């Protein structure tokens, strides 16, 4: 397992605390494993999942900055134009702003503050933030995830062989041994398709 290289797609939404826990854990694993774990972060807006009307399409909304989900995706997409490391830093910063700071990721000043904190070129970021280029990416990620892979929530981790799992990592008590946990997670999810669902009972609920 230690010598394996894995590439995974991770479906996420910034509003989801479980996706935040997954991001922190996977970053810890990547920090130790380096190129042996490659992660493609895929947009999966929960606002679209929970839409009341069948006609609602998040990616068809106007590019006017009024939707927080789209705005957060525009922000991280703008960061990615400044490099993979810039994306990585901004991705983590947006989760922190949302879940530790309680900030609204639809507010331009919040996004610009995050961009400044992670060292982005602010003028370039401001220009790229206004692009609607990411809208089609959101559509493609969501549609493929839902229709082709059966993704229903975040975070969902999908391996190259198409096997995947929706995983709730306790963001208040992350694994103390992130790589060991990863090495235990992989063979069950990737290599055991007969394991259809694992769900812990919740005493008192």
Predicted regions and their residues:
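Structural alpha/beta surface segment adjacent to cysteine/selenocysteine redox centers
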Residues: 20-111, 184-188, 192, 196-205
């Amino acid at each position: 397992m230690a010598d394996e290289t894995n590439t995974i797609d991770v479906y996420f939404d910034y509003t989801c605390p479980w996706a935040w826990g997954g991001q922190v854990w996977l970053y810890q694993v990547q920090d130790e494993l380096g190129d042996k774990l490659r992660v493609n972060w895929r947009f999966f807006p929960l606002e679209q999942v929970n839409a009341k009307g069948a006609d609602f399409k998040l990616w068809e909304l106007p590019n006017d900055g009024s939707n927080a989900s789209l705005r957060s995706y525009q922000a991280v997409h703008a960061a990615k134009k400044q490099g993979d490391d810039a994306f990585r830093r901004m991705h983590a910063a947006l989760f922190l702003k949302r879940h530790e700071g309680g900030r609204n990721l639809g507010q331009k000043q919040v996004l610009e503050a995050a961009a400044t904190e992670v060292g982005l070129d602010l003028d370039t970021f401001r220009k790229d933030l206004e692009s609607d280029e990411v809208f089609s990416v959101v559509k493609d990620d969501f549609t493929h995830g839902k229709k082709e892979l059966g993704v229903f929530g975040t975070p969902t981790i999908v391996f190259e062989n198409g096997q995947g799992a929706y995983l709730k990592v306790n963001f208040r008590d992350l694994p103390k041994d992130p790589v060991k946990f990863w090495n235990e997670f992989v063979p069950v999810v990737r290599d055991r398709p007969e394991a259809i669902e694992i769900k812990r009972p919740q005493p008192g609920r």
